[in-house]
Amino acid sequence: KTWYDAVQLQVEKPMTGDTRWGGGIAYTLGKSEQQGNSTDLFWGFDERFQTVADRPRLRAPGDQRHNIVANGVFRLPADLMLSAIVNLGSGITVNARDERQGTGAFQALTYTYTPPAKPFLGIGHVFATQQVDLRAEKPLRLANGQDLSLIVDLFNAFNNANYGCYNTTLQATPNPNYGTP
C-alpha cells in the first residue's frame, strides 16, 4: 500500500508584449510512504513481517521531499532572448539493504537511502540534485518572409554531478564504497 501527499506553491509573472521579462518559481513539498515494499518486486521481502499489513508505514523509494523549479526569460535589445531554468531537489530515495547481521533469511533488512546533499551557490548542503540550463535565441526574418531562429542551449551549466545508483549496502565489515555512485 502506498500514500503520497504534496503541496505546491507557485508564483508566475508572464512576459507580455510590453514587458521585457517573465518567469516563475514553484516549490513542492512531497511525502511518499509505503507499507510493504511495493517498488521492489524481487528484493522487497522482509521475513520479519508475515503480511504487508504487519509492516510499518515507512518512507518510500522514489520520495523527494523538496523540489524547487525556477524559470525566467529576458528580452534584450536586438530581439535577443535569454532564458534559464533551475531545478533543485532534495534527492530521490532508493531501496537499500542492511547486511550487517548477515545475508540469510531473517538477517538482511531493507531500508530507504537518501542521496547526500551538496552545496549550491553558497546556500549550504541542501540539494542533492542541481540543474541549471540556459538558452539564447535570436529570431531572424528571411527575405521570403519566413521566420528562422538561431538557438544555443547550455545544459547543466555548472556541470553538477547528479548521480544515481548509489552503493547503499551496509555490510558487517565497513563498506568503503558506501554512499558512492
Describe each region flagged by the PLM.
Residues K1, F49-P56, T112-G122, N177-P181:
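Extracytoplasmic loops and strand-loop junctions of Gram-negative outer membrane beta-barrel proteins
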Residues K1-G89, T93:
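Gram-negative outer-membrane beta-barrel transporters
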Residues K31, A78-Y113, H125-D133, E137-P181:
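C-terminal beta-signal and adjacent terminal beta-strands/loops
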Residues A60, I123-G124:
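Short, surface-exposed alpha-helical recognition segments that flank or form part
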Residues Q64-H66, P115-A117, D133-L134:
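Short amphipathic alpha-helical surface micro-motifs
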